């Protein structure tokens, strides 16, 4: 049973009805648990649902950004589902960026890598290179270096370090707000959406999961940005729970659209 739920209106102002779709998994043959990328490789009958999901993504009102969750337990095929939807989204002309936080560790490395990875992918496209540069510099304002309380010992490291310090201080003077406004303008001027996919979130440590969601909240309301986050709801809710506040409450404040995938029966997974 697939459950697709949305809390926001489409770009046309119409609320899309919630729906569920049943698929019979009893007669499936043994399959590999490696993620698929092509519709022809879909043996779980998820192609149709993934295409419906992609169409909904394309209809979203993204003037203030939006965050979408693809939720399911380990082995439910979240990555494959996103890959199938990705093809439909790409064919509509949207840019898709990927960030896998599992490849990095620690709060500072996650922050730095998040902005660096996204900006690097943007710079590969001529029409997005300026946005990539601005996003990279925006990210540097949140790295540890940008908030060093003193600079004295750095002076001894030479002129290169002095230039770096001057650059950092200038960014601080300009302020996060000013840099953010530049990015928002560039995104609006693009007049098309950018999709950012974050996978394997549930493989992170508790502190890293919290850091990732802080990063998402930091940039979630950028115009024309769609986040697609794939994770195990139970694991992430557990990580986000703190001081008696349920993690589900935290998630509901972030996610505007969710799709819940059922677990794949063990008899259809390769041994």
Question: How would you name each of these model-derived features?
Answer:
Residues 67-75, 97-101, 196-203, 228-231, ...:
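Extended hydrophobic secondary-structure segments that form protein cores and membrane-embedded regions
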Residues 74-75, 103-107, 232-237, 263-268:
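Conserved nucleotide-binding/hydrolysis micro-motifs of P-loop NTPases
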Residues 92-96, 192-193, 222-226, 250-257:
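Short glycine-/polar-rich loops that comprise or flank the Walker A/P-loop
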Residues 118, 243, 271:
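Conserved AAA+ ATPase "sensor/coupling" helix adjacent to the nucleotide-binding pocket
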Residues 255-271:
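Conserved small helical "lid"/interfacial subdomain of P-loop NTPases
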């Amino acid at each position: 049973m697939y459950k697709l739920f949305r809390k926001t209106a489409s770009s046309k102002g119409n609320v899309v009805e919630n729906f569920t779709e049943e698929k019979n998994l009893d007669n499936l043959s043994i399959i590999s648990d490696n993620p698929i990328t092509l519709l022809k490789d879909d043996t779980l009958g998820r192609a149709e649902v993934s295409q419906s999901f992609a169409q909904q993504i394309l209809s979203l009102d993204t003037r203030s950004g939006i965050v979408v969750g693809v939720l399911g337990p380990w082995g439910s095929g979240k990555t494959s589902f996103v890959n199938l939807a990705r093809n439909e989204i790409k064919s509509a002309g949207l840019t898709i960026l990927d960030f896998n936080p599992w490849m990095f560790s620690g709060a500072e490395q996650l922050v730095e890598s998040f902005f660096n990875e996204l900006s690097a992918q943007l710079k590969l496209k001529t029409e997005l290179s300026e946005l990539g540069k601005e996003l990279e510099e925006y990210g540097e304002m949140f790295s540890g270096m940008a908030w060093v309380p003193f600079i004295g010992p750095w002076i001894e490291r030479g002129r290169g370090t002095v230039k770096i310090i001057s650059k950092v201080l200038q960014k601080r003077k300009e302020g996060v707000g000013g840099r953010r406004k530049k990015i928002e303008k560039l995104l609006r001027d693009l007049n098309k959406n950018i999709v950012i996919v974050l996978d394997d979130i549930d493989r992170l440590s508790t502190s890293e999961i919290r850091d990732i969601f802080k990063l998402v909240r930091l940039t979630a309301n950028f115009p024309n940005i769609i986040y697609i986050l794939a994770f195990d709801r139970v694991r992430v809710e557990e990580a986000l729970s703190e001081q008696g506040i349920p993690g589900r409450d935290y998630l509901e404040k972030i996610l505007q659209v969710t799709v819940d995938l059922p677990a794949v029966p063990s008899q259809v997974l390769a041994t």
